[in-house]
Amino acid sequence: MWLLYLLVPALFCRAGGSIPIPQKLFGEVTSPLFPKPYPNNFETTTVITVPTGYRVKLVFQQFDLEPSEGCFYDYVKISADKKSLGRFCGQLGSPLGNPPGKKEFMSQGNKMLLTFHTDFSNEENGTIMFYKGFLAYYQAVDLDECASRSKSGEEDPQPQCQHLCHNYVGGYFCSCRPGYELQEDTHSCQAECSSELYTEASGYISSLEYPRSYPPDLRCNYSIRVERGLTLHLKFLEPFDIDDHQQVHCPYDQLQIYANGKNIGEFCGKQRPPDLDTSSNAVDLLFFTDESGDSRGWKLRYTTEIIKCPQPKTLDEFTIIQNLQPQYQFRDYFIATCKQGYQLIEGNQVLHSFTAVCQDDGTWHRAMPRCKIKDCGQPRNLPNGDFRYTTTMGVNTYKARIQYYCHEPYYKMQTRAGSRESEQGVYTCTAQGIWKNEQKGEKIPRCLPVCGKPVNPVEQRQRIIGGQKAKMGNFPWQVFTNIHGRGGGALLGDRWILTAAHTLYPKEHEAQSNASLDVFLGHTNVEELMKLGNHPIRRVSVHPDYRQDESYNFEGDIALLELENSVTLGPNLLPICLPDNDTFYDLGLMGYVSGFGVMEEKIAHDLRFVRLPVANPQACENWLRGKNRMDVFSQNMFCAGHPSLKQDACQGDSGGVFAVRDPNTDRWVATGIVSWGIGCSRGYGFYTKVLNYVDWIKKEMEEED
């Protein structure tokens, strides 16, 4: 119970009055003038009212009234619910009277009346007595409307919930058992079973009040709806009791069963129906009763069984069904895969996976696929190389093998340390349908240019001035440039040109960034070079130490030109190698300088070359000083030739390289770049020392070579 309190003083009015107390949850009631003596010849009634849904509880804290036999003189009378709860007077311990003590007075409703009455005097044996009166407290107590009130003797006990009663603080409400609906009077219940729905895979269904008598005038519809792919089975339990007639079939009450809209039975009497296999996932039970009868009704248990699909069968020997089961039911599935090196095919479509699901009608939702051998497709073309089949020609399916190779002797396959070229070039069609190499994976090999290996190396020792023309293939790295006039260069790799910085930014010229860069390769004749066409330049890189404005300082006279497109190497177009040690600059070592420069004061139309020895740096330094020249001759340069030889590079040869044959590797190396000198064939020639710039060259080329 909830007990709520509120102190509300209540005073009595004059004789004959009535005092209603406002609806509060608790308060107090006293006699007039309390705790002073109360007046004589006085009567009033106090009406204590609490909110609806509560009862009134009253307890006296102090009580001191004139005692008398039967409380005839002064008294307090308490009444509630049209009944008297007692008449009280005196005080505790007095021989006369009827004091209330600590008794609790409780009303059944939300009202209680307290009547206070005094006579004309308070005398005892001629002595005037003074009595203080009373002090009482009341409180609102929750009324449990759902508790049985017939014990209280009420003529019309309330509430009258037909089924279930629910009490709450200050009130109550009624509800009904399953299968019934609460009516508008909020107390009575009416059977309602016209649209009961069951969707679980199994369960129980029964008539209302089973196994007690079912109500009259029922029109019940119990619908069972389970997922498609399930079939319902019905099993009736004992007792089965539906009102019937000995001569007429089910004239009063009847249970009709429908499966997929078709009637499969109509039942009544006391004989339990047989177990029913409905072969349906939708069943309706219609139960009708008349206005009379006391039969106990019926109850059944329904269960479901899953529909089965046929065993899956493969279409070829390469298909694998994972975890094959002895039986497949609705919603079961199987996964089909292929043996290694084969792939799933559905129609003409390649599948990455295959799953088939058993449908609600007992069929698989998709047909079994086939397995076809993996096809890696045509192998990728290898730039500057090709491939050949080591298995059946033109067959690119699983386990086929090919061998990539490079176009030798101009290209060589890039190999890893410790691996052979043949291993690098072998690719197999894998089970994943890709060509793959054991070391490189899917990445195809790379054919790198072979440097310094001319097919027709030079053998004669002719001079440029008055010398013999170079033959095709003698200097296949030779580049002819026409930028600020004729110049030369050498091919590095298959897309880089090594040349002198001063051919791009000549000394005693203003710096120009928009000069035409014409580059020609692949022939020894200028006219034929022109016919082969110019090679566009993507990028120019000049060494940062080069100073165009310092005419006597050729420090850093080296530059790189990156071609827009790689060139295809052949007998007349091959790169030269870079030096890797100082032995290429040993005194007296012979090298070759080739170019299209001035020949006997005339412009050459054909490539010519000269054979020159590496000179002593100190001799070159002395020779310069003897000529009163202030030119810078640094450690990044070397000199070649001799004043007595009358052989040298000349105008138009600048940018070409000083080529030396390495006897250990039989490769030609660009040890220097034609940089500067004094006239043509008038002494020493000076060259940029390439070895000192190899790191810069490789960085600029980003190791493309």
UniProtKB/Swiss-Prot annotation:
Activated by the C1Q subcomplex of the C1 complex following C1Q binding to immunoglobulins (IgG or IgM) complexed with antigens to form antigen-antibody complexes on the surface of pathogens. Immunoglobulin-binding promotes autoactivation of C1R, which results in the cleavage of the Arg-Ile bond in the catalytic domain. Changing W435R: In EDSPD1; uncertain significance. Residues 307-373, 374-449 form the Sushi domain. It is an enzyme of class 3 (hydrolase). GO terms for biological process: complement activation, classical pathway; immune response; innate immune response; zymogen activation. It is found in: Secreted; Cell surface. The active site is at H502, D557, S654. Its main location: secreted. Glycans are attached at N125, N221, N514, N581. GO terms for molecular function: calcium ion binding; identical protein binding; molecular sequestering activity; serine-type endopeptidase activity; serine-type peptidase activity. It catalyses: Selective cleavage of Lys(or Arg)-|-Ile bond in complement subcomponent C1s to form the active form of C1s (EC 3.4.21.42). Changing D290G: In EDSPD1; uncertain significance. Core component of the complement C1 complex, a calcium-dependent complex composed of 1 molecule of the C1Q subcomplex, 2 molecules of C1R and 2 molecules of C1S. The C1Q subcomplex is composed 18 subunits: 3 chains of C1QA, C1QB, and C1QC trimerize to form 6 collagen-like triple helices connected to six globular ligand-recognition modules. Within the C1 complex, C1R is a dimer of identical chains, each of which is activated by cleavage into two chains, heavy and light, connected by disulfide bonds. This is Complement C1r subcomponent.
